[in-house]
Amino acid sequence: MAFPHRPDAPELPDFSMLKRLARDQLIYLLEQLPGKKDLFIEADLMSPLDRIANVSILKQHEVDKLYKVENKPALSSSEQLCFLVRPRIKNMRYIASLVNADKMAGRTRKYKVIFSPQKFYACEMVLEEEGVYGDVSCDEWAFSLLPLDVDLLSMELPEFFRDYFLEGDQRWINTLAQALHLLSTLYGPFPNCYGIGRCAKMSYELWKRLEEEEDGETKGRRPEIGHIFLLDRDVDFVTALCSQVVYEGLVDDTFRIKCGSVDFGPEVTSSDKSLKVLLNAEDKVFNEIRNEHFSNVFGFLSQKARNLQAQYDRRRGMDIKQMKNFVSQELKGLKQEHRLLSLHIGACESIMKKKTKQDFQELIKTEHALLEGFNIRESTNYIEEHIDRQVSPIESLRLMCLLSITENGLIPKDYRSLKTQYLQSYGPEHLLTFFNLRRAGLLTEQAPGDTLTAVESKVSKLVTDKAAGKITDAFSSLAKRSNFRAISKKLNLIPRVDGEYDLKVPRDMAYVFSGAYVPLSCRIIEQVLERRGWQGLDEVVRLLNCSELAFTDMTKDDKASSESLRLILVVFLGGCTFSEISALRFLGREKGYRFIFLTTAVTNSARLMEAMSEVKA
């Protein structure tokens, strides 16, 4: 049922070292403020911190009370205050207000600000403007890599997507380059590097500069990971906009997985309490179904329940000695498995109820039609109906964006009509959101006569005119075009299937979207790995508007073992989805690779839309 790893699959590196490093550094920073202290933690850092150092560890290092950073006066009576925050202007103003309030009251305390993952000059400037810079000591907690699972690392920076891909803010690129530098220091150099996208290229170049500055740290080291692939989220928006149908993706879409764990409510736990559950490879039930298409999951869980019952029933014919062994060795494991099984059955039932209510089948049918380019008028009507019924502002936006990207922009009549209906249905406050979506290239309007061929000719003009200095005009008129249909054809993203697609025994990565579509990001990775570079993919790169932004760097490394050359680190800049993770795990099983994922944050279609929205839920 689950994807068993091939017997010859390479072993994954041990990423628990990253947790230990982060914990030790935090303890060191806390001990620089000797004695009892109160710790103020920003909400966004609470879940990551919990995975690294729990409350008892903090208490061992003289943290007395914990507070959440929120916009209200602090009630702390401690003589020492420590703030663990993201480098944000609003946090600086909050800290400054506390320090200034103490000054007004004639109270003297010690203040320490720990920025994670790094401090920015702008933050120090705000503290200076507020007149408190001399009263606080500032430090950095370079915690930028959180292992969520044996093969998944997250920077837990969901704001990376909006900051870079909408605002053009490059501040997190240094954080990413530092994270890659740390990985190459701990796990040896990466002999083969590939990448595509403007952000990927900038991050790669900065990372290489860091490597050169500290030359010698990785020299002579045996590489543990043979390949690294950096990919910008805007290279493939389509995959992130599609509804997920693998189990882990559906759990994320339905319940929101946060920092590797999920809150299951009473409808799942069959009690009056919610339960926080860690979802990773240690959960044996979850690990067997996480990458499966949802249609297979119920059958598997039913079979698992029967097997479990059979194991319980074995005890009936046991003598006292056998019963003693059963209780001491097996019973605890069976009870744990039973608890997890009940939870996942409850989660499946809850997902089924919600999806039946939403008419999920009709939604998936519309998405598939958009991906294939059929019945576009019918799909547009479906979206209009969705808006008129006020189903969900986020869902309606998502479908409009999917229509726009797959059709290379909406024809002006449809763009104006859908936008007007949306604003009338959900409110004029969403107007700025449309501006953001347009700016990011997610929801655009075709210029008159902007057919696919016209767009393609502009792209080729962009490539040929760059020497003549005309690149800026060509790029600005074109940067946000998607060319999805042409790319889909070139890379065979829509499989042609005779008869039914077998979701029980899938033959390709398309199973993560019910056999209708191979994720573009995953297909690019597959093709580049096969070719050991971008040779033969020039046309695809051109259609992706990345002619200057696809790179390969291969160094001959005799120390690289055949095992390390089958380990591939994929870095998603701007977030990746659980569907992409499942698809690449499948590819790894088929080809004998093991993929490791590093993402700025795990994302899905709703998070993508929320990042662009100016209306906060």
UniProtKB/Swiss-Prot annotation:
One matching Pfam family, short form? Sec1
Q: Which GO terms describe its cellular component?
A: clathrin-coated vesicle; CORVET complex; cytoplasm; early endosome; HOPS complex; late endosome; late endosome membrane; lysosomal membrane
Could you confirm whether the keyword Transcription regulation appears in this record? no
Q: Kindly state which keywords UniProt assigns to this record, in alphabetical order.
A: Acetylation, Cytoplasmic vesicle, Endosome, Lysosome, Membrane, Phosphoprotein, Protein transport, Transport
Q: Where mainly found?
A: membrane
Question: What does the entry give for GO biological process?
Answer: intracellular protein transport; lysosome localization; melanosome localization; membrane fusion; platelet alpha granule organization; protein transport; vesicle-mediated transport
Q: Which domain of life is it from?
A: Eukaryota
What does UniProt say on post-translational modification here? Phosphorylated on tyrosine residues.
Kindly list the places in or outside the cell where this protein is found, as annotated in its UniProt entry.
Answer: Late endosome membrane; Lysosome membrane; Early endosome; Cytoplasmic vesicle, Clathrin-coated vesicle
State the annotated membrane topology for this chain. Peripheral membrane protein
Q: Which Gene3D superfamilies match?
A: 1.25.40.850, 3.40.50.1910, 3.40.50.2060, Syntaxin Binding Protein 1, Chain A, domain 2
Residues recorded as bearing N-acetylalanine in the entry: 2
Q: Which InterPro entries match?
A: Sec-1-like_dom1, Sec-1-like_dom3a, Sec1-like, Sec1-like_dom2, Sec1-like_sf, VPS33_dom3b
Q: What does this protein do?
A: May play a role in vesicle-mediated protein trafficking to lysosomal compartments and in membrane docking/fusion reactions of late endosomes/lysosomes. Mediates phagolysosomal fusion in macrophages. Proposed to be involved in endosomal maturation implicating VIPAS39. In epithelial cells, the VPS33B:VIPAS39 complex may play a role in the apical recycling pathway and in the maintenance of the apical-basolateral polarity.
* Similarity field: Belongs to the STXBP/unc-18/SEC1 family.
What does the record note on quaternary structure?
Interacts with RAB11A and VIPAS39. Associates with adaptor protein complex 3 (AP-3), clathrin:AP-3 and clathrin:HGS complexes.
Could you identify this protein by its name? Vacuolar protein sorting-associated protein 33B
Species name for this entry? Bos taurus (Bovine)
